[in-house]
Swiss-Prot record:
UniProt name for this protein: Protein TIFY 7
Motif (Jas): 220-244
Stated role: Repressor of jasmonate responses. Jasmonoyl-isoleucine (JA-Ile) specifically promotes COI1-TIFY7/JAZ9 interaction. Interacts with and suppresses RHD6 and RSL1 transcription factor activities to negatively regulate jasmonate-stimulated root hair development.
Domain characteristics, as noted in the entry: The jas domain (220-244) is necessary and sufficient for interaction with COI1.
Keyword field contains RNA-binding: no
Keyword Lyase: no
Cellular component, GO, one term: nucleus
Cysteines engaged in disulfide bonds, as pairs: none
Family stated for the protein in its record: Belongs to the TIFY/JAZ family.
Gene Ontology biological process terms in this record: defense response; response to jasmonic acid
PANTHER family the UniProt entry points to: PROTEIN TIFY 4A-RELATED-RELATED, PROTEIN TIFY 7
Length: 267
């Protein structure tokens, strides 16, 4: 006959009983929660079936396995209730499918209005003018007219040399008075205020573009002149390096010329 003096067997027996009771309670709670979730899903399906078309309802009856609801926990239900306000504007899906997205105004694609008329912007004389309902053909015609008017404008236009002289004088005045800031700003404003005709600008550009063409024929002549100067200087260097030979050459040339003169003179 065994006796438990310390009472260890009673404590172990009590702890085992407590564990079994806790496990049984957890299993019962889990079974109740799953059962309640299934009942809630079925009631949801039957509640929404009144709003379903007859064809969808018949499909749900024909294929019950495709529309089964799984176990829904209390946390998911709380999340749906908490964030349900964000999906009020979304179109709900009846049985299964993807999660509906909220139709926020910033997510709506912006479609450009087809009735917007083309505009034409003109910059002229420091002003900006905008015209509506201008087709591309009209815009091209306006640009052609402006180009023809710019080429045909001849009134109140100064010659090119006068414009160049005035432009060079302004640059000279600006460089001479660059020491004082007041005179520099005065000259700058004077240069800015003096108008230059469009024809003068075009003629200046044409003259600058035509200048290299006029210089092309003078290039060979300049080369010939530099070559002649080079040969002349080389000849001078050679003559200065050998003066005695030059004297001998001069004497020989003088004697030969004297002999020729004596031979040709009558006796």
């Amino acid at each position: 006959m065994e006796r438990d003096f310390l009472g260890l067997s009673d404590k172990q027996y009590l702890s085992n009983n407590v564990k079994h009771e806790v496990n049984d309670d957890a299993v019962e709670e889990r079974g109740l929660s799953t059962k309640a979730a299934r009942e809630w899903g079925k009631s949801k399906v039957f509640a929404t079936s009144s709003f379903m078309p007859s064809s969808d309802f018949q499909e749900a009856k024909a294929f019950p396995g495709a529309y089964q609801w799984g176990s829904v926990s209390a946390a998911n239900v709380f999340r749906r209730c908490q964030f349900g306000g964000a999906f009020q504007n979304a179109t709900p899906l009846l049985l299964g499918g993807s999660v509906p997205l909220p139709t926020h105004p910033s997510l709506v694609p912006r479609v450009a209005s087809s009735g917007s008329s083309p505009q034409l912007t003109i910059f002229y004389g420091g002003t900006i003018s905008v015209f509506n309902d201008i087709s591309p053909d009209k815009a091209q015609a306006i640009m052609l007219c402006a180009g023809n008017g710019l080429k045909g404008e001849t009134g109140d236009s100064k010659p090119v040399r006068e414009a160049e002289r005035m432009y060079g004088k302004q640059i000279h005045n600006t460089a001479a008075t660059s020491s004082s800031s007041a005179t520099h700003t005065d000259n700058f404003s004077r240069c800015r205020d003096t108008p230059v005709a469009a024809t003068n600008a075009m003629s200046m550009i044409e003259s600058f573009n035509a200048a290299p063409r006029n210089m092309i024929p003078s290039v060979p002549q300049a080369r010939k002149a530099s070559l002649a100067r080079f040969l002349e200087k080389r000849k001078e260097r050679l003559m200065s390096a050998m003066p005695y030979k030059k004297m001998l050459l001069d004497l020989s040339t003088g004697e030969s010329s004297g002999m020729n003169y004596s031979s040709t003179s009558p006796t």
